[in-house]
């Protein structure tokens, strides 16, 4: 395989620099924001793409008649036409179908499937994983164009803003926001509270939320961050805004916050007593046009998965561990913050600013992992930050590789029923061990895959092994850099986080 093609599989092929956010819509409209390296110059570009799906056959589209056309045929680009291209090889997903609007495309597939199955099908997901492969609009755009985020940018080139809510309690249906601390990496900081404008009750809180929205729009960051952002701040803010009738127009275009699914989640009201709707709420994440919403708790968990040296995952514990806490850091017990505010508001303002300063510090130390992955994978930065290594990173890379090669994608594999015991474990001695020396094989399983060329039987392109080769090389290089860097340095933590992300 030519090295240049393998490079395209890993890095994409469109080297457009400085992409800091992509927002794509089902209509085929894509908006791309780009930042010039080393400056605050931001540009917005609009682009068009054809929303697409992967199907195993065209059976559910034949009812379109003359509106179903090979993509090279005259008229295939028309609004009401569906274009198709047959991919090479014997993979499950052999047909790439596209239309000018994803609603047109999905409606056509669902109509055909409903007629074939003699029951009403309203969602592609109801057809099962083997019937269609669909990606979110932004990923469709990035896969089709070969673009990725952050080309030519350093992490500090991003305009990053942190905000932290202080609330009267943890339940947004019963409690309220009384203070918000805000800072960014351009030297700005502020504390907003309900007392400073002479308003009372719900009117004061609604005014506070409106001022927060206006401030974020005025500062115009590429990235919004906090610790437990998706687990507390955003769901609490969204619920309070809904109850107060305030629009959270936090994006660069369009409306307010939108929810997106995530494989894992956390929130202050989850637990054994939570009902199904509350658990779904905890698993959800948020997204907004033109800005990436990053939860530093994800970076902490990813780092500790490999390092296993953190005393806890809470912001204060992590900040102390990494030496980010300032000497005059203000600490207030969570349950006492509101009561402290009533008698000593200056102390709570100090405390809240310390929180956002530490969230920024954690992001700078550990954010390099997701930042590096976003240069490779055709996925929004915010989704890579909370994704696992398999479905989160490798899956979009493999989809892009196969489509770039014009090859049919293999089916999702199912178990062959064979029981596997996993790695071997032996006990050679019992008792208290002294003078222990650790023996470790770096990237053991990927190294075995590389050495013996072990890969999925269905991966006829060898794309997974090619990607693993490149990723392992980068991971081992990051580990070497981390070991060579001074203990506790930003460089060391960044490379450790990058190594963990590629594990």
Which residue ranges define each predicted feature?
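A contiguous, basic/glycine-rich beta-loop/short-helix subdomain that forms a polymer-engagement track
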Residues: 124-158, 411-428, 434
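Common nucleic-acid-contacting/processivity interface regions adjacent to the catalytic cores
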Residues: 2-6, 335-443, 447-450, 489-503
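Short secondary-structure boundary/capping segments
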Residues: 177-179, 235-247, 311, 377-380, ...
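Active-site-proximal helix-loop-helix substrate-binding element of RNase H-like nuclease domains
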Residues: 190-192, 198-203, 220, 224, ...
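Short helix/loop capping segments that flank catalytic or ligand/cofactor-binding pockets
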Residues: 170-171, 190-191, 235, 302-304, ...
